[in-house]
From Swiss-Prot:
It comes from the Bacteria. Gene3D superfamilies: 1.10.1760.20. It is found in: Cell membrane. It is a multi-pass membrane protein. It comes from Lactobacillus gasseri (strain ATCC 33323 / DSM 20243 / BCRC 14619 / CIP 102991 / JCM 1131 / KCTC 3163 / NCIMB 11718 / NCTC 13722 / AM63). The lineage of its organism: Bacteria, Bacillati, Bacillota, Bacilli, Lactobacillales. One of its GO terms (cellular component) is plasma membrane. HAMAP family: UPF0397. Keywords: Cell membrane, Membrane, Transmembrane, Transmembrane helix. This is UPF0397 protein LGAS_1499.
Amino acid sequence: MNKQKGLSVKSVVAIGIGAAIYVILARFTSIPTGIPNTNIEIVYPFLALLATIYGPVVGFSVGFIGHALGDFLMYGQTWWSWVLATAVLGLIIGLYGMRLDLDNGVFTVKQMVGFNVVQIIANVISWLLIAPVGDILIYSEPQNKVFLQGATATITNSLSILILGTILLKAYAATKVKKGSLRKD
């Protein structure tokens, strides 16, 4: 039996297209919060969709590449602590997404609740732990500033994924034929 090594072509394409769309969404759909360098981001529901459909490697890669490119193109420099936080967000959501059966048209209320519990935990890990601690260790940023940014990002990103991410996942599942729904006449 010939076992495939590495990423599938489908995953590589998803990473490339996903990262490009990530950069475009980050550039044109960010809504300022009033907290410096912290926005309401529409890109995170998109990342959650890709991570859930294609898995943790694609989620991590799209988050990492998309955020790194977006930072560089928009600001001329990359904030690696936030890039890593985004990648970890995609990874965790992708790991949970492996438990879902979206390709068979299934996304129940119980699964929606589970997805949102996991994405909120992933946002807390990413924005209240990885990003602020990274900012302190890498960039010597003041604690009060980075934890305020992290708390704001946690709340806004969790809410955007809760609302838009859930809608995207439900819409995606609705486009798939439910397993066993077709019968022979």
